[in-house]
Amino acid sequence: MAAFRSTTAHMLRESKEYARQTLMGGLSGFESPVGLDRRDRLQALKSGDIGFVHSWDINTSVDGPGTRMTVFMSGCPLRCQYCQNPDTWKMRDGQPVYLDDMIKKVDRYKDLFKATGGGITFSGGESMMQPAFVSRVFRAAREMGVHTCLDTSGFLGRNYSDEQIDDIDL
């Protein structure tokens, strides 16, 4: 009986890890930039070539209509008492993700989004702490015909121009 429990527990751990890596998002499927020193990372962040991402998920919950890819960005200047995602507050807790990799991920799911009336949602943390990255992904998503949604406190609204806001559906 002990051997059965041990084998079952091992299989359960393996299946949970498989689900986490392939179905649940996390950061699977993204190649993290390596070899960038601090100065180069800051420049890439400022230009939007990379973004610091806490995690991502495909879901049908409260992050907008239809089936959505919700990207949880790292970093937030606020410390709201009832924050849903306090684990996203620190920018350094996120992983750098290349812009091209994020756009490829959106492209991979665009047919699903169109079939379900879904799209991509940026949440956080505070997405507007990384306006160049989010804006460039939204622009690419809109060019693909993918619905876009920004979940923000609005605290950093000055970081977005009217032109950038035009790429946001909700």
What is the predicted function of each stretch?
Residues 12, 36, 51, 67, ...:
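Conserved Radical SAM active-site core
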Residues 78:
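Glycine-centered loop/turn positions within well-structured domains
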Residues 2-72, 81, 85-93, 108-116:
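N-terminal [4Fe-4S]-dependent radical SAM core
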